A protein has these predicted regions:
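One-carbon transfer enzymes
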Residues: 1-183
Length: 183
């Protein structure tokens, strides 16, 4: 099941237990298992924020959320540029000097340009993946605050037009980080 391995997975149980937040854990990463279907059918939802989810979310799950399911995807351009996997890694590898983190509303396609808001940060020569992830987390928090404010005001506006062309980042694995000093 290597193809289903989630890169850098860390659960949120430490935070959810601390703050008494109920959690549902699906039996299938594709959200198509009977347990998930029953949970979705038995509950009503208004809004969701997903972080680090690396799969499409089925329409029958998305349709259960009145205001939508929102996720993050970044790149050096504007969605749909840089769809796909490991965008922060690719931005560093390609020598990009900026990273646009988009908070977008999920639909049935990967990383669609249904953008609620974008926040940009610089990538410098001194950044590595750890410092870039830290900057990314700060932007994520800011974007979630904006979304929750708009949600409370019942005023979530999503733009679907894009300034950029469609392109894809390929999946990276641990083997891609190996350096052969003999070549």
């Amino acid at each position: 099941l290597e193809r289903n391995r989630v890169s850098g997975f860390k659960g949120l149980s430490v935070l959810t237990e601390k703050y008494g937040i109920p959690v549902f854990e699906a039996d299938s990463y594709f959200l198509t298992d009977d347990k998930t279907k029953a949970f979705m059918a038995e509950n009503e939802f208004e809004i969701a924020v997903s972080m680090g989810w690396q799969r499409l979310i089925p329409p029958e799950v998305l349709d259960k959320f009145t205001y939508g399911v929102y996720g993050f995807h970044g790149n050096s351009g504007y969605l749909p540029f840089g769809r796909g996997r490991s965008p922060l890694n690719w931005s560093i590898i390609l020598g990009d000097t900026r990273f646009n983190l988009n908070l977008f509303r999920y639909d049935e396609k990967a990383d669609s340009p249904n953008v609620f808001a974008t926040e940009m940060f610089s990538i410098t020569l001194h950044d590595d993946i750890r410092t870039a992830q830290y900057k990314n987390m700060i932007c994520s928090k800011n974007l979630i605050k904006k979304l929750l404010k708009a949600y409370r005001e019942k005023n979530i506006a999503v733009r679907t037009e894009s300034k950029d062309f469609d392109s894809w980042y390929q999946k990276r694995t641990a083997a891609d980080g190996k350096i052969d000093f003999h070549e």
